[in-house]
Amino acid sequence: GALGHDAAITPDPFDAATARRLMAEAGFPDGFALTLHGPNDRYVNDAEIAQALAQMWARIGVRTAVATMPSTLFFARAPRDENSISLTGWSSSTGEADTSLINMVATPTPERGWGTVIRASHYSNPETDALLERALATIDNDERGAAYRRIVGIGVQRDLAVIPIHHQVNV
């Protein structure tokens, strides 16, 4: 796997009862409404994935309107922060995790170039930022890999800054 890959990470099972309980504990016993924005021509079955998410979220009280559009329109909205929640994808042309992690779980910091183009979320956590700084400052692959795994453990697994749902393989 890629540097920082953690084979021990497995998807959480869908558990509507627990999700409804957690929503109530968070102050949303009757759920809430949002719009899921996404492209309809960028990823395999992207519009269908958005519809499936809306149907699953409805089971826990999240009333979801789906707004899919051509990717040229969708991606133009992101820098203006016009999307409520987005179906989007990330990859790395270098095989390194830094670019993806900077855009998914780093605090937007223009002077560092972090999160200045497209943000996957409004997530901000000093702990993931410090780990990312450490990973970017070393050439020790073991140290970088450990930092990447910890960043994903905090920002993705624990805090759900992003929710990975689909891995597209291109050939």
Predicted regions: what they are:
Residues G1-Q55, R59, H122-L131, I139, ...:
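Append "and occasionally in soluble cytosolic enzymes with long acidic Gly/Pro-rich linkers
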Residues H37, A54, E82, S100-L101:
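N-terminal secretory/targeting leader peptides
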Residues S84-G89, P164:
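Paired acidic/hydrophobic, glycine-rich loop segments that form the ligand-binding mouth/hinge
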